[in-house]
Amino acid sequence: MRFGVGLPVAHHPVPEWASSLEAITAVTRAAAAAGFEHVFVTDHPAPPQRWLAAGGHSSLDPFVALTAAVAADPDIRVLTNLSVLGYRHPLVLAKSAATLDRISGGRLTLGVGVGYLAAEFDALGVSFDERNDRFDHALDVLDAVWRGQGVEITEGDGRTSVVLPDPPPVQQPIPIWIGGNAGRTRQRVAERAQGWMPMPNPAAFAKTTRSPVLDGPDDLSRFIADLHRRVDEAGRDDPIDIVFVVPDGGQPGSAGFQADVHRRAIDECAALGVTGNNVTLDTTSLEHTLDVIGRYGADVIGARSS
């Protein structure tokens, strides 16, 4: 079981104490010392005010923030959790991801999703109804660019040309983890990704997130079995990461967090086939964040390995 922790910037407004270079450096180094494999940042370039008022969050740009993180520690990996593929032109995304992977020496995992906030698509001038087609097209472009094949375009005068952003990434390929609970998501993972990120999704939130309910181990077990079936049908025998957000025991940093309950739930998820746990923190200052990360490392990560 590997662990990741979110940089504490997924708030609205993004707190000043969490968003400086010094804060990102301190949190990343604390995470590495506590035994976390990676740090992550979410992606909301233009969140609608109505969603924010209802409890949504802003964030730093993931590619910029994670570049600061890789400079803070020589070993920790970084994850976009997750980048909505429809928000960016795929050639721009391929360039950003390859640049971060090159700067980090091959430490990026590209977590991606289809997206569910229609108003954010509207703000960016992108068709929400075409998000699935744009997602699949983006995967095609990323694959072609990173393999060195490039993408053929038609210029304004009618001539064709090949576009191949340079430099290429260090990893061949950059691992892609796809987030979401739908069967279509698991099919994409089985055919063309290196990992799957299912999300806890109680029935009360399913309409907002436009994703199937995942509320407990029975749902998770059923979804994992479905993924394995699809992987077998795709003829793959390479390992696929399954990275969850284990909710049991509460949120680290909150007054009611129960490390023992959380740890037992992680063990149960591992028995189902989960290979990683992404942790989001409930913290209110840099000092609080560093303390919670250290205690999680001792009470959860360290306790499981002892």
What are these regions, as identified by a protein language model?
Residues 1-306:
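Active-site-adjacent structural elements that line small-molecule/cofactor binding pockets in enzymes
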